[in-house]
Amino acid sequence: KTAPIKMFCPLHGPVWRTNLGYYLDKHDKWSRYIPEENGVMIVYASMYGNTESAAQALAAQLCEKGVTNVRVYDVSKTHVSYLVAEAFKYSHIVLASVTYNLNIYPVMEDFLHHLKVLNLSKRVFGIIENGSWAIKSGSLMEQYIDENLKDCKILNARMTINSSANRSNASELDALSDAIVKSVAIEEKAFEQRVIDDAAFAEEEARKAAFKKLSAKERMALMREKHRQEKGE
């Protein structure tokens, strides 16, 4: 059963007294880890600019192929609180990281840690890795996702860069962007269905609320009419 809501008081954040439907919808999605938007968040950790160049090239190629809801962030310059908010917003996340001492670059690892402690789930991940003599960041990021983030999918089209991207990486970049475009198209259908389901739920809730406002006599008359319609009278 539901009761009329006049005020929404989250544990962390302001108290909302107006436009409650908007904020309740946001919290409903966040609590179920459902993305707010079907789009791509590209997060990169770059030491000398080469991983950044690959991330920007991917963003440009996605836009050329029709996926324009794309955001690109430097994990070294953007505070993790903003990155987490965007991770909850978008359906697809691309992690682009250089290898650092046979590990994930520290600021990227910190970002992943925050996703873990906040239980982010139900996302599609793409991977770009970079390194020189021992490229490990990609496999380590995949392992971290598999072990710590629930109900997430990792695209098979990983891009591997040896220090800086060259012509041989063009096919990998193309394959990764194609995989993301295909996945976004699939997710779009799921988004459309959720919109339909949410609208149906809202309509049913409105109908229930209107029914509760009726007098006992009006309710009985409405129920009798519904019964007659069901019998085909």
Label each residue range with its predicted role:
Residues 1-36:
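Divalent-metal (often Zn2+) His-rich catalytic cores of metallo-beta-lactamase-fold enzymes
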Residues 17, 49, 79, 134:
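Flexible, glycine-rich phosphate/dinucleotide-binding loops
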Residues 43-65:
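Short, charged N-terminal beta->alpha structural module
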Residues 39-43, 126:
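Conserved beta-strand elements of the Class I
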Residues 25, 72-78:
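Short gly/ser/thr-rich secondary-structure transition/capping motifs
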Residues 1-8, 13-15, 57-73, 83-233:
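FMN-binding flavodoxin-like domain, especially the glycine-rich phosphate-binding loop
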Residues 20-21, 53, 138:
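A short acidic (Asp/Glu
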Residues 44-47, 75, 129-130:
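Cofactor-binding loop segments of dinucleotide-utilizing enzymes, especially the Rossmann-like FAD-
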